[in-house]
Amino acid sequence: MSMMFLALHISAFSQILVRGKVLDSVGAPLPFAQVQLYAHEGTTPLAATQSNPNGLFTLEVADTGIYRLEVHSLGYAEYLQEVVVGDAGELQLPTIQLSPSYEEIGSVQVEGERPVVRKGDSVVYQVGAFAKGNERSIGEVMNRMPGLYVSSDGSVSYQGWSVSKMMVGGTDLFGQGYGVLTNNLNPSAVKEVQVLENFEESRLLKRVRRKSERVAINLEMKDGAGQVVGSLEGSYGYRLMHRANVSLVGVWQGLQWSLLANSNTVGETPAHSWADPQGLNNIGSGEELSLPIPKPGSIEAVTSTQGSSAPLSASRRRRNLSHMVGFSTVLSPNRRFQLKANVVGQKEDDQYASGYRSKVKIGNLSFNRDEQSQKEVGSYTAVGRVTLDWEAYDQADLRYEGGYSFRQNQSNGWNEGQQNRLSEMGFSRWQRMDHTLLYTQSFDSAGLIRGGFEWQSQWLAADYSAAISGTVPRGLVGKQGLTASYPQALHTGKTLWLYLAPIAKGFTGDARLGGLYFQQSLLTRGNHNRSVAATLQQSDLFAGGAVNYTVGPVLVKAGLLAHTVRQDLEATLPSELPGKRLYLAEPSLAIVASTERHYGLLKYSRNSTTSTLLDVLPEPLVKSYRSTQQGSTEFRLHHGNTYQIYYSYANVLSRNSLQTQLYYNHNSHPIDTHDVIAASHTTSYIISGRRSSTLYASLNTDYYLGILNTTFRAAASAQRSYYTQNVNEWEIPLVDDYLTAEVSLRTHFHSIFDISVGADWRTNRLQSDGPVQLRHSTSAYADLQFTFGPVLWTTTIERLEPGVQKGNPNAAYFLDSEVQWTVLPQKLTLYISGNNLLNSNTYIYYSVDNLEAAYLRYDIAPIRVMAGGRWQL
């Protein structure tokens, strides 16, 4: 390791730093301005970067002399300046203030802007070119932009890369939990979606890493500094249904805030989840360097999973009442200090109803299920975070991040079987407190050190009970009922220190050193097993590094990370359980080739995890009234070898893109499971299994046909997994195939019509020693929109055929329609909407898993007819 440090340090060469700050026309810091440095008469930039959220930038040049500095930013006039670089090692430029770009054209009106443009490392999408006018969130519009894909939880990917941050006006308001912004910010106030490639928020990290593997998004609002923008929306309708939404963003010099609120009974979950804190993960300019912190386990009532996991959108299946409020603020009193604070609270009540009918035959085991279930669940979520960034001095930064997270769930359900009625109650309360201190020290030409300390504490109260009517047992539930409780506490400490070497003759690299310690306390209680108190301690020490070599557009990366892991378990058992130490190494090799339009990746990595000594406890843990889990029989290592090929193409100006991937994972030491299934009151069996390998391939493409103003989007994926399933004395090899295909087409003529059609197909094929089980799911939709002056009419027709067998059709039809009337342009819009207008009360879904094929009947959300209005500030 010391030789690696020495080699990286000796190969460094001296650089001259050119620093500056960019302001907008009112004197506020201007983020993401493109800054380029040319030779005095040159045409190719010698150095380029973009200003950070505080307007600051740093460029590096190798020689003294006279240069030309150019600064560009959308909406501002080009800035040119002659720069004389001496041999002082560093040059501080005067503050640069840009002027707005206006063009006097008399009475001539310029219609529209280019929908997509590239500015250096930024790709800018005009929201108006992709919005239809009836979207409820900016995420709906972004999902139509070429290269962008938005998940249901609000997370975004660009050209296959996960977006790490989403900012508003250059300010990061919600951190990694930006999904609440994607799903709740009204698009009517957003002018541009700016995708920032090679994004790096650390000003010091930019000095040693000119390129980053991170991607971020900035939402540029329609109004400038000193304004409050956003919208207020409300609707009310049939069966007392309602939807209300507040979406506000305020910007002043040195202060920015956002207020998001939502209350609805139309199936929306405003905050799907809250991302884990970044902590010390991925602090090295995009290199994958993550040590996941374990989470405590919980118990899930069976009636709580049926219905909530139905393969249908939430607005189609949920009977809900949801309330959410989120507030975030960023305060920058001076250029060296920034405070970010945000809080999100949510309350949800849900109702689901479903039926379950199946037949299982394994060897000489055979049993049937015929059950009807209903459940109610209530949940509370609260999250608060604070981040402090301090530029201690020119070559050092300090960051503190801390937060508190809370989630409570309570469910009540009943299950009507052939023998009797089963009642279930589940309760869980999870809390987490976390603190991270991150220090960054730059040594200019000698590289950079970055690292710190992280601490997390988690607490979980998990209780479960089940009872039957009568005396005939249901699974594990007898006449005495079933109770289980697993209170847990988990405390984790982590430290990581990273050295990043500067670039020298195409070579660079890093070295890393750190450790992780956690302690988990578990108390098992209930009438199915005796009480056991256990405390598990684990330490993980690791060291390693990576070397990168760049030649032209090709980058070769080789890395190695070595671990030593030890676990010790103390439990209230007659015999003492010894501790154990394991050693493991994780090599990786990647070859990357990239240009402005093309990106290719070949990668190999070895990933290792360990089981937990808690699994060797002789008392099994209750999972539900149907089963218990005993886990692995020993503390051991699990290996996985991953091979990946990835290619993407993006022609932003023509709005065409393509991403394709081939992924193979082979587990030489796969994970074991060990469950005891109480299938019925007369039948039980022991099941254990392991996954040995998975092959996955995918293709996504966007194609724009300009002559017809039509966008074509297609996606396909295929996955094959190999398993070995052991049921009592039988060993069953399984092959699981999963195929998907999606296609959509959108054509529109501005201000007259907008038509979208699409379809998708999914199939699951499961093959074992017995018969092949096969199911299909298909859907198709047509989305029609027409404009008649101030009136906008939208109608969506959808056909779903979920989980069907050949020759057994099972279609459900849905009709949604909305009429909008713009009373005051850019201000007031009134609308009447109807959802689920053609649906029946239930639909049937055919499901297959490793051993069981089942027919599930789900209730569908009722018809919704509502009237409302939206006021834009």
Protein language model regions, located:
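Structural motif
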Residues: 19-30
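Membrane-proximal, glycine/serine-rich, low-complexity loop/turn segments characteristic
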Residues: 27, 54-56, 70, 76-79, ...
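Short Pro-Gly-centered beta-turn/loop motif in secreted/extracellular proteins
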Residues: 28, 58-66
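A short, solvent-exposed loop/turn motif at the edges and junctions
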Residues: 38-44, 66-81
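Short, acidic Ser/Thr/Gly-rich low-complexity loop/linker segments typical of extracellular
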Residues: 41-56
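Extracellular/periplasm-exposed beta-strand and loop segments of Gram-negative cell-envelope proteins
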Residues: 301-303, 307-320, 351-360, 367-383, ...
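Face-selective signature of the C-terminal outer-membrane beta-barrel domain
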Residues: 330-348, 377-413, 422-571, 594, ...
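Conserved C-terminal beta-signal and adjacent last beta-strands/turns
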Residues: 740-763, 773-873
